[in-house]
Amino acid sequence: MNATTAPLPYSAARLHELAHVLIANIRELAHAGWTPATSSNFSHRLDEQHAAITVSGRDKGRLVEEDIMVVDFDCLAVGRPLRPSAETLLHTQLYRRFPEICCVLHTHSPVQTIASRLYAGSDVIRLEGYELLKAFEGNTTHETAVEVPVFANTQDMQVLAAQVDALLDKQSMWGYLIEGHGLYAWGRSMAEARRHLEAFEFLLQCELELLKLRGTRQVVPVPHS
């Protein structure tokens, strides 16, 4: 390091490690078709004041280490003058609020986007009775319900973040939808965030398929033996 170079306020080694974790997982989600047209954004807590996050406008299926940047929890770029996602605040608000949260994933699969449009007027999607509800941290039985909030889309992230915070004041949750947009899911690790994301995707797809069936024929409950 020369005399004119200020030390980085975060661990470069840790950033290198997290960049590869992010890239590997994001590539899988991109190949699944959940990040079309450079959409979606992903982050991982770097330390108590910083997060590693995808640079805006990059093809998520072809990310390299330079496509992962650092922001502080005020959403300011740190280390390199790159542009983070316009939705960075929706990541950092979770890191600020929950010290245990280490990963936030935002995707735009067709299932997520269609469900967000279909249920926009209801403000929530109620998932109930599914065995896979146990995929969400804290759930130990299928005999429960998980409500997925559906927020109105807006380009004003301050407004949306305030709405998310207001709901978090009232209930615990592991994700939410934005109308006509996509899904946010998070967890205490990349593995847990992926599990929550995949569980939401599967359960939302089940709900959409049930709606199709109910639209064409009556669904008769199967009696328990």
Swiss-Prot record:
What does the cofactor field's note say? Answer: Binds 1 zinc ion per subunit.
Gene Ontology MF term list: methylthioribulose 1-phosphate dehydratase activity; zinc ion binding
Instruction: Name its pathway.
Output: Amino-acid biosynthesis; L-methionine biosynthesis via salvage pathway; L-methionine from S-methyl-5-thio-alpha-D-ribose 1-phosphate: step 2/6
Q: Spell out the coiled coil positions from the record.
A: none
Q: What class of enzyme is it?
A: lyase
Q: Cellular component per GO?
A: cytoplasm
The GO biological-process annotations, alphabetized, read as: L-methionine salvage from methylthioadenosine; monosaccharide metabolic process
The domain of life for this entry's organism is Bacteria
Keywords in alphabetical order, please: Amino-acid biosynthesis, Lyase, Metal-binding, Methionine biosynthesis, Zinc
Q: Which InterPro entries match?
A: Aldolase_II/adducin_N, Aldolase_II/adducin_N_sf, MethylthioRu-1-P_deHdtase_MtnB
Q: Where does Zn(2+) bind?
A: H106, H108
Give the similarity note. Answer: Belongs to the aldolase class II family. MtnB subfamily.
> What role does it play?
Catalyzes the dehydration of methylthioribulose-1-phosphate (MTRu-1-P) into 2,3-diketo-5-methylthiopentyl-1-phosphate (DK-MTP-1-P).
Q: What is this protein called?
A: Methylthioribulose-1-phosphate dehydratase
Q: Which organism is it from?
A: Xanthomonas oryzae pv. oryzae (strain MAFF 311018)
